[in-house]
Amino acid sequence: MAVLVIAEHDNASLNDATHKVVTAAAKFGGDVDILVAGEGAGDVAAAAAKVSGVRKVVHVDGASVAKQLAEAMEALVVPMMSGYDAVFIPATTTGKNMAPRIAAKLDVMQLSDITDVIDTDTFERPIYAGNAILTVKSSDAKKVITVRGTAFEAAGEDGSASVEAADAPAGPFKSEFVSEQMVKSDRPELAGAKRVVSGGRALGSKEEFDRLIVPLADKLEAAVGASRAAVDAGYAPNDYQVGQTGKIVAPELYVA
């Protein structure tokens, strides 16, 4: 039995979400391999090789997978699945984009946003905005699974996996990367932050939000969060939104 984990990264560093997905994959059982697909992502592959419990890292370098678009990743991953029982993907924007296409090409049901692995066929995932837990059983021979990283501890970094090179899909593909606008911040990334300070509509204005929430977050070296109502009212930008329609968080300290 073997599991393929698709690494979340920016071609420069390995996102901690990958470590958490490795923990979930280990609960599934069997050997765990990591796929690092990107352009100039050698450092990412080296970091992935150090993740505990990983057998090997498959490093695919090429312009076609630089941004891990769904078409290119499907063309890469689907042929690889002959050697794997499941593919585990972080439930991030990138992961949620590629997983449905991979599942469709494999003709299997995607298992989304899981929070626990019961056995090789049975998984848990939240429903009704997290107010209930659904147990899902799949009879598909191949599993395509997105993982809610906040539900799992991060794997350690005492591994020494081998790194193997593989070819990138040639393309061309119908979709292509045009541009991206990244929000730059010195704060921790909200979804993975250990400390979060969050504000809601009761603060009354953007000025009060900035006066009360931001300085406290600075003191605690925390990420800043906001409720949907606060975001809709213009107190905070969309990328601060926490909850069902925003970022899922599981910090050690949450102040609201």
Language model features with spans:
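N-terminal glycine-rich FAD/FM-binding segment characteristic of electron-transfer flavoproteins
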Residues: 1-256
